[in-house]
């Protein structure tokens, strides 16, 4: 059994609406349906081949793994509308993050903030925070996974990553956005 904490569980109608809306926004208006290989048929008949061609076009446009993972990552991490994340924001310069984390007990995801990730190639990930995507690799990808998998991340788990500039930048941006807070 899987228990989901903090992410949205969409209805099928929300999924269809979201995917189609996203496809319309990102779609190419210049592409047209064509069926040059259509076999002769009765003038009023919609042939099974035509239906199969439309189905194939829809599958290519809407059901690619890349398209769906992008939409789902943004959808499930869309922040709660009744929470003001900026109220939690603490501006910390990337160069000072390591010292801040060293004094901390934990990094805590703020109420209403949502994190998720999808795996890419060679250890890279797409990291989704509050509806926004950031592509990460290396240590930053590993740190992002730790942050996505826990609501409260003990500082001793984060500290080894703080020698990496990209990790410092990641934590600084999450603190500045109000997505994380430092527990001292």
Set out the residue ranges of the language-model regions:
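A conserved active-site cap/scaffold subdomain adjacent to cofactor or substrate pockets
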Residues: 1-69
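Active-site proximal loops enriched in glycine and acidic residues that flank catalytic Cys/His/Asp
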Residues: 5-7, 129, 162, 184
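Alpha-helix initiation and N-capping motif
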Residues: 9, 13, 140, 167-168
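Acidic, low-complexity/disordered tracts enriched in E/D and polar residues
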Residues: 63-148, 172, 183-184
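Short capping segments at the starts of secondary-structure elements
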Residues: 145-160
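Short amphipathic alpha-helical interaction segments
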Residues: 161-176
